[in-house]
Amino acid sequence: MFVFIYCLQADDKSLLARFYHADRSLTAVASELDSFDGRAEPDRCTRLVSRLRQNQDKVLAITNLIMEELLGDERDPRAFRAKFPEEVLQDNLAGQLWFGAECLAAGSSILNRESESKEMRPLAQAVTKSLGNVRVLLRDQCLRNNVPNSKTLHLDFNDSTTEQLYESLKIFDHLFAEFELSYVSAMVPVKSRHEYEMQQWIGVLFSETLQRALKIGLLEQEMVDAFDPGLMFSIPRLAIVAGLVVFTKGPLNMDMPGDELSEMFRPFRTILIKIRDLLRNLSKQELHQLEKLLCTNEEINTNVPLGSSSIEAPSPEHNNTSSSTSNNNNNNNNNSSSSSSSSSGSGSNTAKTSTSSTHKAVERLVDHRNNNSSTVAGATQPSTARSPSMLSLSAGSTPTASPAPSPTPSHSIASTSSAATTSTNPPANWSDYDEDDEDLEEEVGMLDSDEDDLNDDSDDDIEVDEYIEAQLKAIVAAADCASGYLIPNTNLGNLFQAQQLPLTDNFVASEDDEFGSNAATERQQQQQHMDELQPGDQQQQQQQLQDEPSTSAAMLAAQRTLQRLHLPSSSSENEQAPSSNQQTTIKTPNGNQSMPNSSSSSSNHNNNRHRHSHSHSHSSHHHHHHHRHHHHTHPHHQQQQEQRLQAADHHHHHHHHHQSHPHRINRSARKRCSQEHWESTANAEQPAPEQTPGSADTSNASSFSDEVSLAMRSTTARLKFKSTENLLHRLFVCIAGVADQLQTNFASDLRQILRSVFLINMSSSQDEDIDIPEKTKESELFEFRASENDVIQESAGSNQSIYSAEEVNPELDNVFNNTNAAVRHSAGAAMQRNNTIDLASGNNNGNSNAAARNHVARSRSLGDQEAAGSGTRQDEQRQQQQQQQQQLQQQLQMQRQRNNSVGSNSPSSASSSSSSSEHNSPISTRSGSRRRLHSNSSIGTTSTITPSTAAATATTMSPPAWIPDGKAPRCMSCQTPFTAFRRRHHCRNCGGVFCGVCSNASAPLPKYGLTKAVRVCRECYVREVRSSRQAPAQPSQAHGQASRPQAASAS
């Protein structure tokens, strides 16, 4: 009977007693809900349902604590919570699950989840039944084995009821965990096992990125140890760069299928592929500058030449010089072609010698270009002579087309091919000669279906030159207008929209969309072309290709790069050409004829040329025409050039007469033409086996063509930008946009990943104590910041209350009484009551020293070491108040009213409540100010009050200090722990930390100068409202009420 009576005590803090009172409250609310019709009184029903769910939360929270103590490691694992969204893991999740289980057990269904509700209904019924059994057994234990205010359970394990409780808790724990997984999975999307593993790999990528950034000096270890907020933006940005070009086989491998990517980066797959293509064209120095830019947001240094950014556009004088130089090179090319055709039977040694010398020339030119030397110096080398095939590949050689070697092997193909392509071209020729020849080839290729008109038209070349020059000027002007400079007011959403052609064409320079649609057609054409070539003829053509200067440095450099990467090579140095055969044959389009390739076969060559252009595709036409006219003498070569110009001129007139076939010369067409020609040339260079021409080497040729296509696309991607600075700026916008979008779309996942990364990469000295040390100097003001401990362990840093609007002294924090909520008084209230009471007795020093000792003891318990010297400052303040005590008589009534507003009339009660608060408070409390020390030392004495000090106090009284959020893990009224969703709120009257429910009142505080309503706790609101009502109603009783504190202190 004694135990039953004691269990009714509200101040018992044992687990069983707390469960008993919570369960009784829940039962009372449930009974009241059942006592009336909710449809008749909806407001009352809503209010009671809210109370019911709060009580359910409290009962399940206490039950969970009991299970933690009794079951321990035998509890059912809840590792599945790692797959839940962070927003689901709230403190009231258990209450929501209980409420949902009762609704499902009663026959209700989740909205739009009828099938899932039907499946969960048996489990919900089992959960509610098991929970009811646990509540009955726990209530019985409360009456049997409760120990008042015990921190642990004292159960009789030899009792059968205790054993029954133990088994019931295990069953309920298992059922509740199973129901939690089913219910949450039906309500919100839950990660699959693969998605969770991919998120872990993303965390590994972030950690590796941070370690790499620390190693190369982009970040500092002190930033990691201090949890620098800037790292939360820098690490995801750097991780995107590292995942695309450094850790290419990691979770950001864009070659894997889209459904295998992490759900965080799956929406950005297209833009990440384009970013990767651009990153592969950056040199090591450019990549480092981009990563530094992503960390610091500094401006790009345009004074330092990076890669080829210092190369400027050519002047007209340079264009003229380049034209003459190119003509000389063509002459040299023709002479060398004739000499090579006459010595084609010299075997493979000659081919090896010429190839090796060409490789050396390429290396010299690449080094020469990367060192920003003279732009025309390499044009005089015979190995760099231009052919139409080479011109078509280097048509867009802008100043940014020559990056240095790549930091990773995965992008060496693109970078080497790009460097080889542009190293053979003087930069002064980037706008005139290259595009001239390219457009000529394009126009010739578009005349395949007009053989008869081709023979009839014989206009001169001047009109063709003028037409092509006009077209090229229009193209260059369009390219300049559509260059990659950023639009100032364009947001990230507009940049990522694929429908906006002016942005997406130049946003990231990738030609996947252009070449993707023609990939199947190109492969079919290549296969047909390979089937038409005979093995012996192809070997002879390969021998010719080795001897031709038209193969030039770009092809050889690409072949050399592919050989280093163990990829299919187009070099046939190991092939032995027949030395006895002095004539090489070329397969005619009909497949039945072969004609000798000599200087005396001009007419046959011209006739077959037209039949060839009539029957073959555009790319095959370029290939065969290229091989024919380079194996004849110089006059014949000039004759073919004249025919080609006439064909172009004919196409010009044909275009004007047939408006139904508009002539579209644009950048995409030129690049597609270059792509087809490169692929066809590379495809033709692959040696076919003698037995089966379409077997394994055909697949090797296709693989080589794909590699070269990738290199060309990466090169043409960079050509969209005018300078390296513009390219880096655009990459910064793209990468930062994707990383910052993760902060919005996947905030919870990103927080979990970054939290793990910080914990992994912290220095060992920071692992022990993460909390921010408190400031110890009195002159320094305390500005609250969310502690890292809250951010990491409680996930509460980002959702805590805002920083204090006032700068607060650490000495001004108050002492709160949390357990005795009905009679809570702060030391700040005591300060307000007694701050102007002066000492008149002889035991001033004794009381002052005792108060100072008490203050120092409390301060040291909080780590505030500076309060030890506050006794001297208190003596000085007391002397100043003694000098002003004669001036306080006129404001006595105002001071008495302020005493009434505090809610306590006895200083001794304030002292006792403060000491009780110091003993019972669950949080670390802080000491008072100098004025509070003086007020505490003045207890038990009489005083007089001067008007000036009271007036100054009434007008300049500062608000009480706020308890730091890190010192208050629970609400100071209801003791509910704070979480990411239960935020902290400070009372402006007492400075305490409360939850939103306990601090939902607002009232003006004129004594602090706050005339508008501000947030106050419930108890301060009651006191303030009561004082505001009593102050005008009882003006005549002010003197009597004010005399009571003095009488009490005198007694």
Swiss-Prot record:
Q: Where does Zn(2+) 2 bind?
A: C987, C990, C1017, C1020
Give start-end positions of Basic residues composition bias.
607-637, 650-672
Positions contributing to Zn(2+) 1 binding: C971, C974, C995, C998
Transmembrane ranges, per UniProt, are: none
Q: Zinc finger (FYVE-type) locations?
A: 965-1025
Biased composition annotated in UniProt, kind: Low complexity: 319-358, 392-401, 409-428, 533-549, 568-582, 597-606, 840-852, 879-924, 937-960
Q: Where along the chain is composition biased (Basic and acidic residues)?
A: 360-370
Where are the stretches annotated Disordered?
305-440, 516-552, 566-703, 837-968, 1028-1051
SUPFAM superfamilies hit by this protein: FYVE/PHD zinc finger (SSF57903)
Q: Name one Pfam family in it.
A: FYVE
Keywords associated with the record? Metal-binding, Phosphoprotein, Zinc, Zinc-finger
GO MF, one example: zinc ion binding
Which residues, renumbered to this chain, carry the PTM Phosphoserine? S569, S570, S861
For this record, an example GO cellular component is: early endosome membrane
- Polar residues bias located where? 371-391, 518-528, 583-596, 692-703
Q: What does this protein do?
A: Negative regulator of epidermal growth factor receptor (EGFR) signaling.
Q: Which PANTHER family match?
A: LATERAL SIGNALING TARGET PROTEIN 2 HOMOLOG (PTHR46465:SF2)
What family classification does the UniProt entry report for this protein? Answer: Belongs to the lst-2 family.
| Name assigned to this protein | Lateral signaling target protein 2 homolog
Q: Which organism is it from?
A: Drosophila mojavensis (Fruit fly)
